[in-house]
Amino acid sequence: MDKRQTIFFDVQELYYLPQYLPVYKELQKENVFDSKFIFHHGKFDDLIKKVIQDECLPANWVQDKNHALKFYLTEKPNWIFLGNTFPELNKIHIYSKTAQLGHGVGPKKSYYSKSDTPTTVRFVESDYRFKRLCEMYPEDNFQNVGFCKMDPIINGEENGIDFTKLGFDKNEKTILYAPTFYPSSIERFSKNFPADLENYNIIIKPHFFSMSKQKYLKQRELLHHWESFNNTYLAKVDDYSLLPYLKSADLMISDASSAIIEFAALNKPVLWCTFLQLRWNYRGIFSYRFKARMDKDYNDYGQIARPANSYNEMIKQAKNLLDSNFTLSNQANEYLKKLAGTLDGNASKRIVTFLLENC
């Protein structure tokens, strides 16, 4: 190879970063690639600049997807990593190869529809996902590499949270509430949620959109109310990675989030809230819209997590699970392998190996 290869990571949203970073750190071990993170301007630019500084990331900024497209066509990197669909890939593919690396393994149909606009390759997490995508898009290139986001935990590189810094008693058990933005359980929780679990530390790690988008203002109001309780920490927008909380928590409560799979894969108990706040046009005669949004994989959550069909049931089950000796069933492990693949800490290495072989 005559010159170093260039790889750009397109960071349209900050929460793409935990999926990219393990690959970037693996790339740094090779003397082949120059990497750069391309951030999109938005309301949290100052926060992102701090992340760039803390992680020592080589970075450029673009205004939006159209600006990013022009930038990529001008710079002509060898590879561009994307976390979602991207416009006019046919133009980009004249000069560059593209790789899609999704940020989660959740039950929404968007997991699969991201391949409606085919990249040069898409890295996927499990044999089941690989086979299904190959059936849906037989002309496209998929590589089953594993779930690289989890590599830092599996490899012992993730230290977890600082309990003292968060004002927590390390001797108390810790609950992680990690809801998604829609459909969400947030609005169905009691205003006294932290008081109902007063003997435990509670970390609330909402989706980035719940903390940033205007349409989820009511969610933020409730989240900030819960933050006022002494046993509760509300993750800030710059707490962009879920990994420290996955590492340190004893129990997760969630809803339609891929975090359920990530936490259960660590052989820890998960409560799956099936009581969701649906918009009026997703209820009653319009319930087909909710079903259309969620993939059939959503039904597998009941095999991995303990369903809670109401708020009161959730509180009761949370206490019971934290007071018991939990271990995942063999059946749950089979479903986890189906959705998240084998977690061996080597997914990032397999991605880099593919890149080395396809320079």
PLM regions and their residue ranges:
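C-terminal alpha-helical cap of glycosyltransferases
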Residues: 343-359
